[in-house]
Amino acid sequence: MSLGQENVDPVEVSGSHACLYELLCSETPKWTPLRVEDLQTSSSDPRDRLEKLLKQPGNKYCADCGSPEPKWVSLSLGVFICIKCSGVHRSLGVHISKVLSVKLDEWTDDQVDMLVGYGGNTAVNERFEACNIDQSKKPKPDSTNEERNDFIRKKYEQHQFMDPKDGALCTYQQPSRTNTSPPSLCSASHRSTKNRIGHAFRNSWGRRESDHKGPKKSNSMAGMVEFVGLIKVNVVKGTNLAVRDVMTSDPYVILALGQQSVKTRVIKNNLNPVWNETLMLSIPEPMPPLKVLVYDKDTFSTDDFMGEAEIDIQPLVSAAKAYETSSIKEPMQLGSWVASKENTLVSDGIILLEDGKVKQDISLRLQNVERGVLEIQLECLPLTQ
């Protein structure tokens, strides 16, 4: 990638992409924005293109703390980040930062195109840290989680380091000429509106959850949390779920672990939905239960509650730590969560070591609702992945 603008052909941009390009190229920048065509190779594998993007100089280090070899991406912000910073990004909520793994998640060409369109860590930091004069306060690889949380929230959620005039740069959006242009990074007002909508969504279901489980922890505690691993949750399917519309429901699932929450897509008109959708969460210490909530999506009113359950992930995490470096090749049972009248299990949740992975299949009877069963699969991953 060129470090200057000499002998660089003009880049034709349009739509929301134009705003970001104008911002990044203004006032004689010291770098040239990446172009989608620069990363298009004869290979059609998105992962190959992603690996090539990761080798760009600015992307070799975490955008927030500078740790080398970041293995995580905030797709919605366009930055490569380390495992420690990824936990804070997840706590921001997917309406601000949607975190994916370079290695563990399946990538599409559209997602890589979107990432390329942001310009990489250098380009994004030029914008989000435009007024971050005191670089000494930026986290280092060995900074505490409290320091990371404070900086990352100020940077992406509160926009404290952005140029004040940045929000006025994109009052006009050029018409898009293609359907693959990445979302604009230029509209602070749009981002703020999106944040308010996201907060309203989280608060709406959070209040309903508090009716059953008590108040949530404040965000001020998020930075004091240490992360001990990752939990990969495959929401498989629901069976005989409750009716919340005339004769059916439009269900979706929310997973919450500490300050983090993620949700599946909505499946319309189905009491036996099959999601088969994989979601990822960081595991905090101390380790809270994994909360599972099911809702019916409504267009003109508050989403209806369809049941909930809690999962103790401590046995799975303990088993994963014990066998993290195991060379055992044959499938092996490591433990089980026994179904009883005291818990919500339909059948025993067996913890298995298979192909070097520690997994647990769980069938849950939803609580505080008239009926419904949810099947999920858990996998515990070490922080090194």
Swiss-Prot record:
Q: Does the keyword Metal-binding apply?
A: yes
Ranges annotated as C4-type zinc finger: 62-85
Q: Identify the residues that bind Ca(2+).
A: D298, S301, D304
Its annotated function is as follows: GTPase-activating protein (GAP) for ADP ribosylation factor (ARF).
Q: Which cysteines link up through disulfide bonds?
A: none
Where in the numbering of this chain does the Arf-GAP domain appear? 47-169
Query: What keyword terms does UniProt attach to this protein?
Result: Calcium, GTPase activation, Metal-binding, Zinc, Zinc-finger
Give the protein name, as stated in the record.
Probable ADP-ribosylation factor GTPase-activating protein AGD11
Q: GO molecular function, one example?
A: phospholipid binding
Q: Where is this region: Disordered?
A: 197-218
Any keyword Zinc-finger? yes
* Cofactor annotation: Ca(2+)
> CDD domains from the xrefs?
ArfGap (cd08204), C2_ArfGAP (cd04038)
The record, for Pfam families, names: ArfGap, C2
> PANTHER family, from UniProt?
ADP-RIBOSYLATION FACTOR GTPASE-ACTIVATING PROTEIN AGD11-RELATED, ADP-RIBOSYLATION FACTOR GTPASE-ACTIVATING PROTEIN AGD12
Segments forming domain C2: 212-326
